[in-house]
């Protein structure tokens, strides 16, 4: 096998939810579709302080931070900048959750909102879910691109189950952090 043209490091924030749909699945699909052009490494605990580790990559994509430690993540972003490696921070939820959000207390106690804000400021580029959210993020960093949320309709869990009925059914997909959103419906 010849060397792929672009080697991308993907650093998901978790092993479910947002990481599956916005980090892991899209990059695996990219490599499947264009194996001669892209090689994807998925790393949940990258060596954030190792300059040589990052030298092997052409781009680093992460969700909120490169690994779980925000301070090390900021150092990693600076290493990438020094090496000329583009960084792309993906964010799908507002970093300052309202008091009715299940994680509000944890976010505030651990100052995660501040740490996410700092990641957004220093990242080379940012991807997010909507134009409205992009406008908010542009207050911190002008290099924002919208990649709407999506799922793979071929996955078994998203296959429709035909039911012979005259009743219209509407599906909704979201995590517990979006329960308040259901009140709008």
Which residue ranges define each predicted feature?
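Acceptor-binding helix/loop patch of EC 2.4 sugar-transfer enzymes
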Residues: 27, 88-117, 154-157, 164-166, ...
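N-terminal pre-catalytic "stem/leader" segment of glycosyltransferase-like enzymes
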Residues: 1-67
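Conserved catalytic-core segment of nucleotide-activated headgroup transferases in glycan assembly
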Residues: 10-33, 39, 152-185
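Membrane-proximal helix-turn-helix segments that form the acceptor-binding/catalytic region
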Residues: 76-82, 106-125
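Short catalytic/ligand-binding loop motif for oxyanion handling, primarily in non-cytosolic enzymes
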Residues: 17-19, 51, 68-70, 95-99, ...
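An aromatic- and histidine-rich active-site surface loop
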Residues: 64-82, 173, 182
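Donor nucleotide-sugar binding/catalytic pocket of nucleotide-sugar-dependent glycosyltransferases
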Residues: 121-158
């Amino acid at each position: 096998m010849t060397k792929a043209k672009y080697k991308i490091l993907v650093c998901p924030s978790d092993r479910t939810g947002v990481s599956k749909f916005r980090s892991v699945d899209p990059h695996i699909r990219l490599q499947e579709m264009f194996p001669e052009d892209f090689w994807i490494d998925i790393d949940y605990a990258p060596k954030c302080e190792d300059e040589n580790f990052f030298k092997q990559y052409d781009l680093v994509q992460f969700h909120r931070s490169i690994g779980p430690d925000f301070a090390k993540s900021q150092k990693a972003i600076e290493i990438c900048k020094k090496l000329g490696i583009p960084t792309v921070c993906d964010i799908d939820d507002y970093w300052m959750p309202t008091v009715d959000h299940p994680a509000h207390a944890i976010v505030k106690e651990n100052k995660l909102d501040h740490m996410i804000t700092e990641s957004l400021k220093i990242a080379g580029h940012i991807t997010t879910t909507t134009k409205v959210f992009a406008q908010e993020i542009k207050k911190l960093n002008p290099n924002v691109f919208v990649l709407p949320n999506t799922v793979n309709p071929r996955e078994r869990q998203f296959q429709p189950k035909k039911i012979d009925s005259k009743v219209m059914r509407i599906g909704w997909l979201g995590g517990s952090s979006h329960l308040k959103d259901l009140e709008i419906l």
